Amino acid sequence: MSVMDEIVVTKPQARTSASLEKPSLIGMSREEMGAALREKGVAEKQIKMRVSQLWNWIYVRGVSDFDHMTNVAKDMREMLKQHFTIARPEIVEEQVSNDGTRKWLLRFPPRGAGRPVEIEAVYIPEEGRGTLCISSQVGCTLTCSFCHTGTQRLVRNLTAEEILSQLLLARDRLGDFPDREAPQGTIMPAEGRKVSNIVMMGMGEPLYNFDAVKQALLIATDGDGLSLSRRRVTLSTSGVVPEIFRTGEEIGVMLAISLHAVRDDLRDLLVPINKKYPLKELIEACRTYPGLSNARRITFEYVMLKDVNDSLEDAKGLIKLLKGVPAKINLIPFNPWPGTNYQCSDWEQIEKFADFINSAGYASPIRTPRGRDILAACGQLKSESERMRKTERLAFEAMMIANHGADD
């Protein structure tokens, strides 16, 4: 049996068009939810109680149908159904790799984009954790030369609802809400939550969609709802320097930097945002990241490109650049994609690079590709519909997911 023969592919029922026309309560803050209920005639003295009820049903119980809210009066449920939705996005396709990696192709309404848009989310299970990679934009404004996503133009930002919906849907499909059963024969953590960690490493630059990302992550880490630990949430940025401090101050999650080069001339080519925010400014922003300590290190992502950035001189430059910054360095074997001019570094060279960094006192794990058989590894993600149309690229760095964030 071939690798591809072992993949399970399903296409669940599409989301109804009626639900697309109503505003979703998902992604609203408590204040916004209260204002929405007030506008529909809910008595002022009931607002706080109703918001608390809805918050619990949506984020603790994980319901996607108002009729399942059994402690909410029937007339209230009818009003909610008439004016709002808590439906999940349409699942166009679900794929399950033989290593347990899952990839969902999700479809959202146009919202100014001219047509419905699609994004992909990836779940990677390990023995002690399950990590979900989430997107913040449809497409990307950055044009990183080694990244497949850079070949797709930015279509639009995702809303807080759409960012959170990726997490809610994944927990639905994995049986990760109370009184839900996990799919049979599924590889996932033996104990605890199925989705224990999330990483903002999907399509797009999250710090170019700061407000929606902030709202979604504050809800995801709310102790009375989804209750994810901030130490288990990692936001990855290519280096939008002005928003880095705000991320630590206002969101308080773990930070990852897509570094990939230690010289400005090379990083200008690989990660063009470096022309606007060069390495000196980026590293200084990292040094002042709120909450930074040896227990809350910044992860620096470094894709290994043959004869480009993989020499021992580059390794020495990396150690010098990060001196004094509590850091972990993720070395990522490059996944070639059609049309790229880059190659992955030889494995022997990657190991030499890693050994040098380790000898300097930095943790430098080499990320093992996951989900390659369903094109879910770094630089490989692209929807089936996009492959057929070949007009846009849906790709993002998912191979770096494993082991991001703290363990406690």
UniProtKB/Swiss-Prot annotation:
One GO MF term attached to the UniProt entry: rRNA binding
Active site: residue positions: E120, C378
Cofactor: [4Fe-4S] cluster
Reactions accelerated catalytically: adenosine(2503) in 23S rRNA + 2 reduced [2Fe-2S]-[ferredoxin] + 2 S-adenosyl-L-methionine = 2-methyladenosine(2503) in 23S rRNA + 5'-deoxyadenosine + L-methionine + 2 oxidized [2Fe-2S]-[ferredoxin] + S-adenosyl-L-homocysteine; adenosine(37) in tRNA + 2 reduced [2Fe-2S]-[ferredoxin] + 2 S-adenosyl-L-methionine = 2-methyladenosine(37) in tRNA + 5'-deoxyadenosine + L-methionine + 2 oxidized [2Fe-2S]-[ferredoxin] + S-adenosyl-L-homocysteine
Binding, S-adenosyl-L-methionine: G204, E205, S236, S258, L259, H260, N335
Disulfide bond residue pairs: C133-C378
Purpose of the protein: Specifically methylates position 2 of adenine 2503 in 23S rRNA and position 2 of adenine 37 in tRNAs. m2A2503 modification seems to play a crucial role in the proofreading step occurring at the peptidyl transferase center and thus would serve to optimize ribosomal fidelity.
NCBIfam families: rRNA_mod_RlmN (TIGR00048)
Name by which UniProt lists this protein: Dual-specificity RNA methyltransferase RlmN
Gene: rlmN
